[in-house]
């Protein structure tokens, strides 16, 4: 899952949102440096990632990107899932997505003193380029694919990922539809468990 999905699977809890979004930027024991609510978000993110990687729909979606991108295929699928979530009118109208994106940026701003250095350096671009909302558009996904390729070793072209998304759009959307209800149920249960710990 990518930024939008992790924010969505934080169930409106401010510290969970922050922890869920910064988790990939927090290594090892550094998670113990954060308040309990943010730590729970970090742990929830990692549990969601494990669930995502093992889900049959994700394995099916990754197969579409495997030949061109091998180990990075899961990262492309994470972005694709955010696209389908942003465009899922059963979850977000355009206005609801706008409000959700703005609310998420506001929570990150409010908790700015807890953002790890690398996330804090990236966050102004996320907000100014409106990543969370623009996942709704194919051009927004193309920007994300290009960013992924820029940051990755051994990759220099994202055009094949766009070709896969456009040519396999229906199959990939079916993977999303088979996956999202399951991950939402899993994340809700896990979030409740973490709240009780």
Spans of model-derived segments:
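N-terminal leader/auxiliary helical segments
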Residues: 1-197
């Amino acid at each position: 899952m990518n930024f939008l999905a992790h924010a969505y699977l934080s169930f409106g809890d401010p510290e969970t949102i922050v922890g869920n979004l910064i988790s990939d930027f927090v290594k090892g024991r550094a998670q113990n440096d954060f308040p309990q609510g943010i730590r729970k978000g970090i742990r929830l993110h990692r549990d969601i990632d494990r669930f995502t990687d093992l889900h049959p729909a994700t394995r099916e979606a990754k197969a579409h990107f495997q030949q061109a991108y091998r180990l990075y295929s899961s990262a492309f699928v994470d972005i694709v899932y955010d696209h389908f979530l942003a465009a899922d009118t059963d979850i977000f109208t355009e206005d609801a997505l706008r409000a959700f994106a703005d609310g998420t940026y506001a929570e990150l701003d409010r908790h700015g003193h807890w953002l790890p250095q690398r996330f804090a350096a990236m966050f102004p671009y996320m907000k100014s380029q409106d990543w969370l909302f623009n996942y709704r558009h194919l051009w927004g996904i193309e920007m994300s694919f290009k960013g992924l390729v820029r940051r990755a070793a051994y990759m220099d072209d994202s055009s094949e990922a766009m070709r896969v998304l456009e040519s396999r759009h229906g199959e990939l959307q079916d993977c999303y539809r088979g996956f999202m209800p399951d991950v939402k149920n899993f994340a809700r249960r896990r979030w409740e468990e973490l709240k009780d710990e």
